[in-house]
Every structure is written in structure tokens, then in C-alpha cells.
Design a protein with these regions (language model features):
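Single, function-defining residue in the core of a domain
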Residues: 2-15, 21-149
Length: 149
């Protein structure tokens, strides 16, 4: 998950971190964006990445992929829906899986049904995503689990 903090208004922080633009120009304090990889049951932070607030959570999360254990499943919140990030995540090690809520209006093609509420699907990646994530293929295969809550 991600968080943004204000830092002390010092010349050092101003040089290192950006200030968000507001209606009246530049914001009051330099800000830091941080993304954490947290163990689910204990909420202990296993890894974190931080940078200026103008760096996206997706870019910071990508830095955490190499620090994720093999044979694991990572739960993302819906704000992390990026096929580039998800492909990078699973390709960064052995049997690295991910789970996140499906965004509304996500377009996919069913490859085959695996069971009730369980399908193998193909997701088409955009040219923009492939430009940002050079290893991203044109089509991305994923398992889609659907549940009624």
C-alpha cells in the first residue's frame, strides 16, 4: 500500500523531494511517497520504497518485486492495476503470484473455464504500457477468480 508524507520544510528536503502543485501554485511542504510490502497477518513491513511524491506508486511498487519471496502471493489493492507492474512482479522470481480486485470494465478474452468462477483469461496490453514496460508482451494470460460476496 502507499502513503504520502509531508517533510520538514528544509533546503535539503526541498532539493530531494518535490512539492505538490495546488490552486495557488507550489504546495507548502516537500512530500515523500512510500510504498510498503506488508505481511498480511502481522502487518509487519517486509520492504519499502520511497521517493518524491511525483513518482507513482506503480514505479515504487516495481522496486519491491525483487524483494518479494519466491512461491508467494501478493495482494494488491485496486489502485495497483497495471499489467506492466503485474507482469514484472510475477516474472521477478519463481512462482510469484498476485491477486487484486478486477477493475470495472476490464476487457478480457476467456481462454478456458477451469471451474465455477474460475477462468483462464487473456488481457491485451496497450502500446503505452509496452513502451513503459519493455518486457511486457502484447497479450498477458491470467487466472480470473470471481466470487459473489
Amino acid at each position: 500500500d502507499g502513503v504520502v508524507w509531508r517533510t520538514a520544510d528544509t533546503p535539503e528536503n526541498s532539493a530531494a523531494f518535490s512539492r505538490p502543485a495546488g490552486r495557488n501554485g507550489i504546495g507548502g511542504y516537500p512530500q515523500v511517497r512510500m510504498v510498503c510490502l506488508m505481511e498480511l497477518s502481522s502487518h509487519l513491513i517486509n520492504a519499502s520504497a520511497f521517493d518524491s511524491e511525483n513518482v507513482s506508486e506503480m514505479r515504487l511498487a516495481a522496486q519491491l518485486a525483487e524483494r518479494t519471496p519466491d512461491m508467494s502471493i501478493t495482494l494488491f489493492d485496486k489502485g495497483f492495476y497495471s499489467l506492466g507492474l503485474l507482469h514484472h512482479w510475477q516474472m521477478s522470481g519463481e512462482k510469484r503470484h498476485w491477486l487484486l480486485p478486477l477493475k470495472k470494465n476490464t476487457q478480457y478474452e476467456v481462454v478456458r473455464k477451469l471451474g465455477r468462477g474460475d477462468e483462464l483469461v487473456k488481457l491485451k496490453t496497450s502500446p503505452q504500457a509496452r513502451k513503459q514496460w519493455p518486457a511486457l508482451p502484447e497479450w498477458f494470460t491470467a487466472r480470473l477468480l470471481t466470487r459473489t460476496v
